[in-house]
A protein has these predicted regions:
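Assembly/oligomerization scaffold segments
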Residues: 1-245
Length: 245
């Protein structure tokens, strides 16, 4: 039986919204699987093994006695939690500096190649990342093969330090962005990866074709134009990961 509908009835919307997200990067997953992690003193709730388990965020917004981390707004949770990452034991002082800088280190049984490194800090609290990171890599003989000092400006911190044939990488955290805080690292990538979403993609064209006789299956093609207003990509003199574009 047919159901009568009004002329204005529309079973399908005239406009569909589709959001595209894509990643571009060079990451060595086998490095995370074989890395042997050590660190400076860590807090009682810290879990060092979680920095290389591919889970790159905290499972909750946890309350502590650190500065402004016991906010009575109903959003905070109590420890323990399933995903807490690595947390340094000492807190920074009034000036945001440590008496002794906390650190993370990873050693490998075989040589590794990484185009760079990515540190993922706690994104449940605003500005909850270190002021400065000193990254140093070493070869099989313990000789330093590269070092770079960087200054995080967000929870996802990319370190452009190409490192071939290294056996050990050391991250030293110099101070916190907010005084009286710990350093929290949710994840470490042995490589660099950039993510593009609706905020960084200016246009997208999707092309699909169909063979009416089903003799072949054509591949769909996607052309995306990214927002390069921050000049990360320079066509004449590309640097960093964009050398691979």
């Amino acid at each position: 039986m047919m159901v009568s509908t009004s002329p204005t009835y529309a079973p399908y919307t005239d406009l569909r919204q589709v959001e595209l997200v894509f990643d571009f990067g060079v990451v060595a997953p086998e490095a995370a699987q074989s890395a042997q992690a050590t660190s400076s003193a860590q807090s009682s709730v810290s879990n060092l093994s979680q920095v290389t388990d591919d889970v790159e965020e905290m499972s909750g917004k946890y309350t502590t006695l650190e500065h402004n981390m016991w906010v009575l707004d109903g959003t905070m949770e109590f420890y323990p939690g399933s995903q807490v990452g690595w947390q340094s034991d000492p807190l920074s002082g009034d000036d945001g500096n440590f008496t002794s800088n906390p650190w993370l280190e990873f050693q490998f049984a075989a040589n590794q190649d990484s185009y760079g490194f990515t540190l993922i800090f706690d994104n449940t609290q605003p500005n909850n990342y270190p002021k400065e990171v000193i990254t140093t890599v070493y070869d099989l003989n313990g000789d330093q093969t590269g070092t770079l000092t960087t200054y995080p400006d967000g929870y996802m911190h990319v370190i452009n330090l190409p490192s071939p044939d290294y056996r050990r990488v050391h991250f030293e955290f110099v101070g916190t962005n907010i005084p009286h805080r710990r350093v929290r690292v949710c994840g470490v990538r042995f490589g660099i990866q950039y993510s593009y979403n609706a905020k960084s993609i200016s246009s997208v064209t999707i092309r699909q074709s169909v063979n009416p006789w089903a003799e072949s299956l054509a591949s769909a093609e996607v052309d995306a134009t990214i927002d390069n207003s921050d000049q990360l990509y320079n066509m004449i003199n590309p640097e960093g990961l964009y050398l691979y574009l």
